Swiss-Prot record:
GO terms for cellular component: cytosol. This is Alanine racemase. The lineage of its organism: Bacteria, Bacillati, Bacillota, Bacilli, Bacillales. It comes from the Bacteria. One of its GO terms (biological process) is peptidoglycan biosynthetic process. Catalyzes the interconversion of L-alanine and D-alanine. Does not act on other amino acids. The modification N6-(pyridoxal phosphate)lysine is found at K41. The active site is at K41, Y266. Homodimer. One of its GO terms (molecular function) is alanine racemase activity. Substrate binds at R137, M313.
Amino acid sequence: MTLQNFYRDTWAEINLDAIFENAANMKKHLPPEITLFAVVKANAYGHGDVEVAETAIQAGAGYLAVAFLDEALALRKKGITAPILVLGASRPEDAQIAARESITLTVFQAGWLEAAQSFLEGTVLTIHLKCDSGMGRIGIRKQEEMNEIERFLQKTKCFVLEGIFTHFATADQLDTEYFSKQLARFEEMLTWLKEKPKYVHAANSAALLRFPNAVFNSVRMGISLYGLSPSMEMKEVLPFALRPAFSLKTKLVHVKNISKGQSVSYGATYTAEEDTWIGTLPIGYADGWIRMLQGQEVLLEGGRSPLVGRICMDQCMVKLSREFPVGTEVTLIGKNGTECITVDDIAEKLNTINYEVTCMISSRVPRMYLKDGRITGVVNQLI
């Protein structure tokens, strides 16, 4: 495999076939009339926004979703023409640019609509209403709020109400009591509207995988699009296998033998108990490979070796079982021979969730895109 467009031997590999397969399998899992929203916020959970967006659309997604307007505008600038929903709050003064770029905004206050109207200047903005059914984040909570919004929309032609949605807080937990309360609350909220809009969506990855009765007519596919389970609890109850798309790799840039009693890295936290081969890897906490990963195993030629000493900003060190040549490929996340380190393994080490692991691999790390076993593109945001 030839490395292209970057000058440090550290990169992430994104398997677009896996993205396609996950989206296509989800489409098969759902009734054919359901619209799939592919969630590509946070640079597609660290996988690459435009590449994932294009692949998801090819697999049958009918809509894209991002966190804030900047992310939507970035997709437009990169040539994405599919509908895009901004899930988070936006400023009223930015309504015009959203309307001009055919970007759908989330709304949950009549006052926001009134303020945004003055900025639209004849353009029409498509909106989805957000309901807070129990997440406690943003959204309409009371019927009076919904009625006030509906009355305002009836007297203006500046807005098109296209959708309404909520977000489940506990759909990834086996205990369904709170989920059921939220679902019932959202169903009640839907009765507050005189007429339902085109899209009604509540199900995130966890809900759409587990609760087909909660999908309404649209769903938002986030973490499962990337081949990752919404939670460790859910891994055993998935209706179909998810295929992880993310791998993280580097290469040995230096190999040396240190004597018994010699130490490695800041703080001298690792001291060799015997003569030991040490390799240096060009990845560190500025790349998202944070200091808490000291002691984590990596894969070389199908075997496991631990990281020793503190992880530095740009480099870290690995204890080798023998002398390996400089340039040997090292897998931090992914498969190497018969061994595999998963995103979930790293999340467990860090006492966090798989979402955070892929999101925290920084823009310093180039993304290499693979399709049919071939490199189809490399994105290096530094150059």
